[in-house]
Design a protein with these regions (language model features):
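Active-site and adjacent substrate-binding regions of carbohydrate-active enzymes
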Residues: 1-335
């Protein structure tokens, strides 16, 4: 079968050089994961594309509904549960073939700096290999393309024609395509607020996102509270030897799954637990996690605002995301 062919390819190529390989694989089955990314699997990892096809319609983009926070949460958790400790998925929010993650997974009108950091934290702290796509660390959003001629991607132009055929006018069709087009992830990187975002003095292959005046690297590097600095903090936390056992190797255990628009999970380790929690609501929330009672919780990362975990209750502001270290009373034996 296919796995036999992939193993032959791996034997003749990747394994000879101990190469690290990541597969683009859709519609995988749980029972096949061992063959793909287990200890003797064909690949080292698989990109997690499950979130990118939420609400996908065979009719096309015009029939695709916006992603709700609950859908994102459950899809992420379904993948984490299916993979378990078989191997490590390559976790993404966006890539060169997708629209910008903050525009896809954060409801319109709520794409603040805080919300973007919250989404980044919820994804970055999962079990697996976090991948950052250029511009993600700045919170780059989808581009407001002025016309279909500004879009280069052939599939996006096909979707535009499909929209027109089902009765949408040109403005409506452009709005649909602008939301889903892969060209959103291909606009020039926004280095500063100068012409063309500082990317080039020439003519770029695609238009520069007009938001470059406000969203650019120069305005965020070294600035306390910026999205860029938050991502640096997340990288530093994942590289911290004190938390390696939990964040790198620990299992993911979702909690509060019945709490609408609250996404929370534990990373379990021998030395400590890590609690990652985010509030997608546009208002403050208080949730109860009984196992926190009597335990010391220390904030490791916070996207802004005050946050308390007292007597098993966690208070979150609107669109707040927090990473806690939960200290264990005694060392846990992980099998």
């Amino acid at each position: 079968g296919v796995v036999d062919l992939l193993n032959e390819m791996a034997d003749r190529t990747f394994r000879k050089h101990q190469a690290f390989t990541i597969a683009e694989l859709f519609n995988w089955r749980k029972e096949d994961l061992e063959s793909y990314i287990g200890d003797e699997g064909c690949f080292s990892s698989i990109f997690d594309f499950a979130e990118t096809v939420i609400n996908a319609s065979p009719n096309g983009w015009y029939d695709q509904k916006p992603v709700e926070p609950e859908q994102y949460k459950q899809t992420v958790f379904d993948v984490q549960k299916s993979v378990g400790d078989v191997g490590y998925m390559a976790n993404i929010i966006e890539n060169h073939d997708e629209s910008r993650g903050v525009s896809r997974y954060i409801p319109e009108g709520e794409r603040s700096t805080e919300a973007k950091k919250m989404l980044g934290g919820l994804s970055f702290m999962l079990r697996g290999l976090p991948f950052l796509y250029q511009g993600q660390e700045l919170g780059m959003e989808n581009c407001a393309f002025p016309s279909i001629e500004a879009i280069d991607d052939v599939s996006s132009r096909d979707e535009y024609q499909r929209c027109l055929k089902v009765g949408l006018n040109e403005e409506e069709a452009l709005k649909v395509v602008s939301h889903y087009s892969r060209d959103n992830g291909r606009t020039p990187f926004q280095w500063n607020d100068e012409k063309n975002g500082g990317f080039t003095t020439g003519t770029p292959w695609l238009m520069v996102n007009p938001q470059y005046k406000d969203i650019n690297a120069a305005s965020q590097i070294g600035k306390e509270g910026s999205i860029y600095e938050f991502y640096k903090s997340m990288i530093a936390l994942r590289r911290d030897d004190r938390y390696e056992d939990t964040i790198v190797y620990g299992v993911t255990e979702p909690v509060l799954e019945d709490q609408k628009d609250i996404m929370a999970y534990f990373r379990r380790g021998e030395k400590q637990d890590i609690l990652v929690i985010g509030n997608f609501r546009d208002e403050a929330a208080e949730v109860e996690i009984p196992e926190l009672k009597g335990k010391t919780c220390q904030v490791l990362l916070n996207n802004g605002g005050t946050c308390m975990a007292v007597d098993g209750k966690v208070k979150l502001e609107a669109l707040q995301g927090v990473v806690f270290e939960v200290k264990l009373t005694k060392k846990r034996t992980v099998v």
